[in-house]
């Protein structure tokens, strides 16, 4: 029986191909857990970003925090909107990771992505996902994010309205009822254009930067003591999110205004014109520091948790398959 341990231990690095046939339900569950973890822990930062961006004259983070802390229930107010945020991020992440895995697995089986060349060139690294070319990383990340964003858009609108102090909604139900009554079902999709314009390039750039950073970190540490896959994923996730966030922040600022005041701003182009004319170019970068901080932490947490869950599950599935052949 002692001979069984060695083949299993040696087999671990070769479990990557199993990701092509990973159970969809497990990818959904891993994405859900990773999204819930990051959204609940980082809800105060998300709320602060919404409050800073909502004003025609964006207030400072310090003054916003001071106002919340001086309220009757500061801790509760910092986590205001946690339920819609957790629903949006949790199920949004589940849909996103499931779609992303399906797209990447499908593309990896074609000759369009140079899958084999990539694997031979850089090795398996710390990723639980199939390796793709730069353009495929960009395209799959963007497509999966926009699809998940559309499905979760009503929850996103409820979250933003509930977090804002523009509205006095006492519950998510009252918020949803008021939006449908005054704006129709269309109101639940306010700002989708700006959201898609933000999420598509953000997600595409994120996956591109994330995979490249993991390859770079794996290559630069290959001659020294190898760090754990989780540490490589965490650092890569944080850096990739910071870069992608800085590039796409104007779309996020516009999206927030559209979801809070759709009657005033109307559409994305009109919103940009009004914001620049009334508040200057700096309004397009309102909440940038908060968004970078939150996105860096949330993406690092979400992707690390997701990839570790998938890697461990696939190792187990691979061992089970190997044992079944004995």
From Swiss-Prot:
What's the domain of life for this entry?
Eukaryota
Where is the major localization of this protein?
Answer: mitochondrion
User: What biological function has been recorded for the protein in this entry?
Assistant: Mitochondrial glycine transporter that imports glycine into the mitochondrial matrix. Plays an important role in providing glycine for the first enzymatic step in heme biosynthesis, the condensation of glycine with succinyl-CoA to produce 5-aminolevulinate (ALA) in the mitochondrial matrix.
* Transmembrane residue ranges: 28-53, 81-107, 138-163, 191-214, 232-258, 287-305
Supply the SUPFAM superfamilies for this chain.
Mitochondrial carrier
Query: Per the UniProt entry, what is one GO biological process?
Result: glycine import into mitochondrion
Concerning its family, UniProt says: Belongs to the mitochondrial carrier (TC 2.A.29) family. SLC25A38 subfamily.
Membrane topology term reads: Multi-pass membrane protein
GO molecular function terms here? glycine transmembrane transporter activity
Q: What is this protein called?
A: Mitochondrial glycine transporter
Q: Which UniProt keywords apply?
A: Membrane, Mitochondrion, Mitochondrion inner membrane, Repeat, Transmembrane, Transmembrane helix, Transport
Location within or outside the cell:
Mitochondrion inner membrane
Q: Which organism is it from?
A: Emericella nidulans (strain FGSC A4 / ATCC 38163 / CBS 112.46 / NRRL 194 / M139) (Aspergillus nidulans)
Q: Where are the Solcar repeats?
A: 22-106, 135-216, 228-312
Q: Which reaction does it catalyse?
A: glycine(in) = glycine(out)
**GO (cellular component) term, any one:** mitochondrion
